[in-house]
Amino acid sequence: KDLEQAQKNSFLIWQKQDAVRSAYNSYDKNISGTAEAVKSAEDALAAAKESVVAAFDSTYKTVKDCRTTLAAKRTAQSQAELDLKTATVKYRKGIISKLAYQQAQDAVTTAKLNVESAYLSLYTAYNQYEWAKEGVLITTAAA
C-alpha cells in the first residue's frame, strides 16, 4: 500500500509518463524515428518505476535495520547498567579499583549515547520513509 502511494506520488514516474504521452502525441508512422522515441520513452518509464521500487525498498529496510539496532543498543544499555551495579558493590567492598569502577560508569554513559544515536537514526529513517510515501525518493535513474 505504501509502495503504491510512493509510485503514485513520484515526480520521476510522472515525468517519464509525461514523456511517453508526449512521444505518443508526436508519433507518426510515416516519420522516421518516432517509433523509436516512443519505445525509448517507455523504456525510461519502466526504468524509473524499477528505480522507485528499489529506492522505496531500501528506505523500508533502513527503518527495519534501525529498529533492530535500537533494540540491541537498549539491551546493551541494560547490561551496562547491571554491570555498573555489580561494579559499585565490588568497589565499595574493595574488590575492584577505582579505575575499573569508573570504566563501568563510562560504559553506561557510552551505552546511553549509543541508544540516543540509534533513536535518532530510527527517527531519521522513519521520516525518510514518510517522505518516500509522498514520492520524495532518492533514486539512481537519470532525470
Where are these regions (language model features)?
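Secondary-structure edge/capping motif, primarily at the C-terminal ends of alpha-helices
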Residues: 26-31, 52, 88-91, 136
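C-terminal structural cap/anchor segments
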Residues: 54-55, 69
